[in-house]
Amino acid sequence: MNKMERQQQIKRIIQAEHIGTQEDIKNHLQKEGIVVTQATLSRDLREIGLLKLRDEQGKLYYSLSEPVATPFSPEVRFYVLKVDRAGFMLVLHTNLGEADVLANLIDNDAIEDILGTIAGADTLLVICRDEEIAKRFEKDLAAGL
């Protein structure tokens, strides 16, 4: 089996199972007759670009980092002037008096990975489920500036 076929198998396993460790991936591969070293598996996972996310119970699992549509409505980008991130929190800067409007838009979008928002006059704090999600949202919002 070549590298490309092996990486396709890894992607298939990740999509089909809720897997949290490289050891679990390695065991799934072995069940399918594919033997890999830890170094090869680590390299494959890095090349595939897997994300490690948390589920509702707080357990880590691997997820494909396939591009997904933006979770934000187009109106959200209209109000954002600047995006900063501190760990799992985003700070969105707006014009004076627009932060509460932006908070309402984000809250109405009901994005599962956003736990809540707190608005000031021109600054909005967005609390994300974890740091990886905050990074993804930061990148998404910054791309629209």
From Swiss-Prot:
Gene Ontology terms: biological process: L-arginine biosynthetic process; protein complex oligomerization; regulation of arginine biosynthetic process
Gene3D superfamilies: 3.30.1360.40, Winged helix-like DNA-binding domain superfamily/Winged helix DNA-binding domain
Keyword Transmembrane: no
Pfam families: Arg_repressor, Arg_repressor_C
Keywords: Amino-acid biosynthesis, Arginine biosynthesis, Cytoplasm, DNA-binding, Repressor, Transcription, Transcription regulation
Coiled-coil portions: none
GO molecular function: arginine binding; DNA binding; DNA-binding transcription factor activity
Cited InterPro entries: Arg_repress, Arg_repress_C, Arg_repress_C_sf, Arg_repress_DNA-bd, WH-like_DNA-bd_sf, WH_DNA-bd_sf
Pathway: Amino-acid biosynthesis; L-arginine biosynthesis [regulation]
GO terms under cellular component: cytoplasm
SUPFAM superfamilies membership: C-terminal domain of arginine repressor, Winged helix' DNA-binding domain
PANTHER family attached to this UniProt entry: ARGININE REPRESSOR
Function description: Regulates arginine biosynthesis genes.
Name of this chain's protein: Arginine repressor
Record organism: Streptococcus pyogenes serotype M1
